[in-house]
Every structure is written in structure tokens, then in C-alpha cells.
Amino acid sequence: MDGSTIVFILTMVCLFVYTVKHRGAKQVPSRTVQDAKPAPSVATNDPSPEPVPSAPEERVARLNRHGSDRKRAVNSDMVEIVMTMAPHVPQEKVVQDLRNTGSIEHTMENIFAGKLD
């Protein structure tokens, strides 16, 4: 082997050892957390106000009941997101549908269904 090849290989080995050594040093925690009892709270003693449904259909119905009935105010970010995904739809129609639905998801469903073309 050539002298420069040996120097290159030794340099690479040294860099590898240096990297492994410093990566291992960063993973050592500087502080240790002592085991402690959690403080009692009122929230842990109260039963949940609404039990978690077990069937997937009930979970979906619960999420739909709580999440999709609310309408959000239309802002420029919502319009920009819809326009990015569907640039062929006029912006006025997007804004109007966002005002009606209050949801990017519902507006996209309307676009896919062809209601805004």
C-alpha cells in the first residue's frame, strides 16, 4: 500500500473512534431522577365524566359528535391549504364552502364529490 493510503485509513479510524466516544458521552445522563411517589390529586380520584366506548363505531360516533359540529372561522391559512390541494377550484368558491362547512376536511370532500366545480 501507498503511504498516503495508510495515512488516510488511520485518519478514518481515528475519526471513527473519536465519533463513537463522543456519541457515547452524550448519551450518559448528567442527572438522575430519584423515584418519588406522585402527589395525590383530585383528578386521579374522580371517575371520568364520560366512559370510553369500547366499540369502534361508538368511538367514531363520539368523535363526530364532539368535533365536527363546531365551525371554525375562515382564515387565509385554511384557504391556502385547500388551494394547495385543489388549485383548479376558484378561490371564491373555496372561501364560500369553508364558511359553510367551517372545515378543511369537509371542503375537500365537497371538492372530491364535484360539488364545487
From Swiss-Prot:
**Cross-link entry Glycyl lysine isopeptide (Lys-Gly) (interchain with G-Cter in ubiquitin), positions:** 37
Regions of biased composition (Basic and acidic residues) lie at 56-74
Under the heading Gene3D superfamilies, the entry gives: DNA helicase RuvA subunit, C-terminal domain
Question: Example GO molecular function term?
Answer: ubiquitin binding
PTM characteristics: Ubiquitinated.
Q: Which InterPro entries match?
A: CUE
Record region (Disordered): 27-74
Where does the record say this protein resides? Cytoplasm; Endoplasmic reticulum
Xref: PROSITE patterns: CUE
Q: Which UniProt keywords apply?
A: Cytoplasm, Endoplasmic reticulum, Isopeptide bond, Phosphoprotein, Ubl conjugation
Keyword Endoplasmic reticulum on this protein? yes
Sites of the modification Phosphoserine? 48
Locate the CUE domain: which residues? 74-116
Misc. remarks from the entry: Present with 1850 molecules/cell in log phase SD medium.
Which named protein is this? CUE domain-containing protein CUE4
User: What gene, per UniProt, encodes this protein?
Assistant: CUE4
